[in-house]
Amino acid sequence: MKLSLSPPPYADAPVVVLISGLGGSGSYWLPQLAVLEQEYQVVCYDQRGTGNNPDTLAEDYSIAQMAAELHQALVAAGIEHYAVVGHALGALVGMQLALDYPASVTVLISVNGWLRINAHTRRCFQVRERLLYSGGAQAWVEAQPLFLYPADWMAARAPRLEAEDALALAHFQGKNNLLRRLNALKRADFSHHADRIRCPVQIICASDDLLVPTACSSELHAALPDSQKMVMPYGGHACNVTDPETFNALLLNGLASLLHHREAAL
C-alpha cells in the first residue's frame, strides 16, 4: 500500500499518521498538513480500495484488516512508533491499531468517532445507501456535503462545493468498495474492548455534527481509561475542514501534551 511521508523536520521527529473517514482520501487532511509538518513527520495515504491504492475489497472486509494493512505498510517504511489522528472511520481504525499494536501506537486523536455506530448515524447511512442505489454515485456525492458541513458554511461556498463534487465523482471509489467499507464501519464495536486501550487519547468532536452526535464522543471518553475530550462549538462533521484554525490549535496542543505525558510515564 502506498504511503505519502513528509520529510522529518528534525532527527527522530515523532511520526503522525492521518487516517481519513469513509471517503478514504488522504487529501482530506490538507488543512492540517502545513502546521503538522513543522513539528512531525506526517504520513498520509489513500485507504485500500480508494485513490492511488486501488483494489477490489472482499465482502467481509473489516476495520481489523484496515488497521493491519496500514501497520504493515508503516513497518515496511521503517516506522515502528507513531501517533494516530483518525476521523470517524479513521478513528475506528486508530482504536483497532491501539488494541492490536499497543507497542507501536504512542497517542490517539479521535475526531468525531464512536464506540459503536449510533442509531442516528445508522439512519443517516441508510438514507445515503438508498440514494446510492437509486441515484448512483452522483446522488451519493451530491448528498455528502449535507452530512459534512454546516449549512451557512456551505451556502457561502457553492462554487467550491461544485468543484469538490466533480472531483469526488471523478475519483469515486466504486459502489462495491464503498458498501464494503461502510459495512465494516457499521459492524465495528469497541464497547467491550475500549478499556484495553492504554495509550493517551484526545477526543475532538463538534457540537453541530449532523452525522455523529456528540454523545458518541462522551461515551468514548467514559470508556477510554486515559482520555480527554474537547468540544468544538462549530464545524460540523468535517470540523477540521470548516474551522481549521480552531481544530489545528486543539490538535497541536493535544499531540504535544499527550506525547509529553506518554514520555513522562515511560
From Swiss-Prot:
Its EC number is 3.5.1.-. It catalyses: carbamate + 2 H(+) = NH4(+) + CO2. GO terms for biological process: nitrogen utilization; uracil catabolic process. The keyword Hydrolase applies. It is an enzyme of class 3 (hydrolase). Pfam families: Abhydrolase_1. SUPFAM superfamilies: alpha/beta-Hydrolases (SSF53474). Keywords: Hydrolase. The keyword Hydrolase applies. GO terms for molecular function: hydrolase activity, acting on carbon-nitrogen (but not peptide) bonds, in linear amides. Belongs to the AB hydrolase superfamily. Hydrolase RutD family. Involved in pyrimidine catabolism. May facilitate the hydrolysis of carbamate, a reaction that can also occur spontaneously. This is Putative carbamate hydrolase RutD. It comes from Escherichia coli (strain SE11). The gene is rutD.
